[in-house]
Amino acid sequence: MLAIISDLHLTDGTTGMLSPPSAGDVLCDRLCDLAWRASWRADGSYRPIERIDLVLLGDILDLMSSRRWLQMPCRPWDDPHLAAVSDTVGGIVDEILRRNVDAIRTLRGLATEGTVSLPPATASGQPVLEAEELPVAVCTHYMVGNRDWPLHLGGTAYDLIRHKVTHHLGLVTPYNRPFPHAADECPELFDTLRRHRVLARHGDLYDPLSYALDRDSASVSDVLAIELVARFVQHAEGELGDQLNPATRMALAELEQVRPMLLAGSYLDAALERTAPAAVRGRIKRMWDYMVDQVLCLEALRRLGGIDSGELTDALAAALKIGRRDGQAWIRRTLEFLERLQGTQGLSLVPHALAEADFRNRRARHIVYGHTHQPEMVPLDASHADGFVLSQTYFNAGSWRRRYQPTQMLVGQPELAVSDSFSLLCFYQADERSGRTYETWTGMLGPAIPTTEMPVTSGSAAPGASIVRAPQFASRSAAARSMP
């Protein structure tokens, strides 16, 4: 049995919000339930599985969302083998491990404390429910994404950092060589995925803003995370201090959670309209636009952009600057730019899954990415030959973080709706799970709404022409309409 989770984004607490402890409980409960179900075989008998491979598919530790970078003379886009850079990465990792003790304890417990256990089986293939349960070995593998890419760097300094991560998370991934970005960089992981006919990668490879020269270097998204989002929030809190009410402070803290990151300006504009007095609101918006201009002048951003620097800066300015917004078209225009940049439709990475060699040669039955924070299951192909059907499917592993999504009613002020999410993918081999090949679990938890908060409504009605009406067959018949 193979389980995959992605995009936990555990931070050092200097930006954004820490993951709730309950997330670890959900993961353990799901894995225990899935292990029990996987132990029922295709012939109807019960035979407990002996092993679960858990793949952490990148962006588990978020090494870029930290104000610690602002306190240092170095940045991730400097030479990563400078002592100052590796020391900063090490300090951030130490703080992440300390501040997220519940999540870390959960992952380590799965690997080392027998968290998942199953009843033994009788000779006739039935569970002995009253007997002491047997622990199931959990082998946890780590793959890097665009927020934890320094763990892909070689060298003694990074070996020491990986050693801490391996110890605290209970990984089977060797610490004395770079954590893999592609599965073939780690033979143990490669064999595990191949047994389950899965091709898995984080997916940042297909996002030019999150992947520049190679996976041993920074990207545009790192510059935006540190020099724009983290610096802006720190500056706003320092400049305005007590003028920020609790709701506005919370809105600023949540800025780091917004994905895609280019929607940060849209989120900030809408959040300030709801939470901040007019005078404070105007100052914050001007401060944001000023910092966007400063970031767009950075040499690092132009160097890492990978496309024409003028085109990139113009597009980033149009997406991020509140002063350049044009109402309901703002979010749509930003998403269209990202689609063109990534070569996708709707920001789904399906087109890239269709181009994978392992999909085209049918070696992989399942193509799995993360990165987008958007859980997906999309059928790719079904091949029929000699009575056998090979179905190939694309999955996105989603996220275990808060998500902000553009609303569909793009009338007036652009809005992003919030929810907390989790997503777990599971793949079976041979006769596990009664012969099934995969199972997915995705959950959404809506936000808590203060009882004193009244809904804010627009003073004007939304135009009705663009609203989808009831289907034709739902309308009343002519006879019915003629009745009094």
Where are these regions (language model features)?
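Extended recognition/assembly regions associated with phosphoester-bond processing machinery
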Residues: 1-484
